[in-house]
């Protein structure tokens, strides 16, 4: 996780996406759960302003306690990041007849899907489940939360997606080649 002032941008979705492409959605879900666990522990042990959305042990602004909804925000998107990109990748591979260029493009799009899913779903869940607390934290009216959430999606989400589009195929192609070579031996 990379701290960016008010929130923490993540790069942990990248190994989760690569892992799901190589190992399949079951192991991808496990990797995603580990991503969620790292997020939970990081936000609990070294809290930032928005950590209440990722750890039920951090008090929600304006209250003395955390919320179990933080576990939904922390784990559900991350588990899905370990599942959905595999289906995107496999679907695109079938559509493009599994040639080498298609593999790189499929990995890039799968990487983008994982990044977009993570940022989009996390911020959507914050909006729908913790909108009032987010408004309190930001010092904005509740009706301004949608714009604030879209700003995060538009900044962090774009950066995280760009990294995934570049790194998932760059690393994934090498690891997939090694996996194929080892399975032939």
Predicted features along the sequence, with ranges:
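Loop-helix junctions at membrane interfaces
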Residues: 1-185
